[in-house]
UniProtKB/Swiss-Prot annotation:
Family: Belongs to the thioredoxin family.
Task performed by this protein: Required for disulfide bond formation in some proteins. Acts by transferring its disulfide bond to other proteins and is reduced in the process.
Lineage summary: Bacteria, Bacillati, Cyanobacteriota, Cyanophyceae, Synechococcales
Record-linked PROSITE patterns: THIOREDOXIN_1 (PS00194), THIOREDOXIN_2 (PS51352)
Disulfide bond positions: C64-C67
Protein name, UniProt field: Thiol:disulfide interchange protein TxlA homolog
Location relative to the cell: Cell membrane
Ranges where the Thioredoxin domain occurs: 34-143
Length: 180
């Protein structure tokens, strides 16, 4: 074998090894913090509204890139504040949550609604929020203080404006009512 062929073979092996390492790294990173996994472990909204603790309601969708980007930060917040704050997650693609989508006027996601310990909405923020902002808001929520970053808007994934067809179980209706 010539030196050029040896070099090319080594480069090919290194490229394959690096590609595999990067792929496995991303798979490992996202498995523990996926939106689906967090949603399955989230407090049901009915429980959150009745247990006397303040609540952060997150409206999300699995396809929402902003929601996916925030998943690690929210997992950290849930770990640190889960004993004093309910974390409820409502998927906008599930028509079950249509009343809540309409009540809180969700038209972009992620959409966060801060509820006091009586279940009253006291603030909201829409779009990607830095961990520091979310943490300060949650700290204020627990302390019964004004939410410092209320009504802040960051980058969002738009909830598509679609009408509800005759079959209300359509997963892509996004809860928008049929125009009159």
């Amino acid at each position: 074998m010539t030196p050029a062929k040896i070099r090319n073979a080594l480069l090919a092996v290194v490229a394959i090894a690096l590609s595999a390492a990067v792929y496995l790294g991303f798979q490992t990173q996202t498995q523990g913090i996926s939106l689906e996994a967090q949603a399955q472990r989230a407090i049901p909204l009915a429980t959150a509204l009745d247990n006397g603790r303040p609540t952060l309601v997150e409206f999300y969708a699995d396809w929402c890139t902003s929601c996916q980007a925030m998943a690690p930060d929210l997992a950290e917040l849930k770990k640190n504040y889960g004993g004093s704050v309910n974390f409820a997650m409502l998927n906008v693609d599930n028509n079950k949550w249509l009343p809540e989508v309409l009540r809180y006027r969700v038209d972009g996601i992620p959409h966060f609604v801060y509820l006091d310990d009586t279940g009253t909405a006291i603030a909201e923020s829409i779009g990607e929020q830095p961990l520091r902002v979310l943490e300060q808001n949650i700290t204020a929520l627990v302390a019964h203080e004004p939410i410092p970053y209320a009504n802040v808007t960051g980058q969002t994934s738009v909830v598509e404006n679609r009408t509800i067809e005759a079959d209300p179980t359509s997963p892509r209706s996004h809860g928008n009512p049929r125009p009159s």
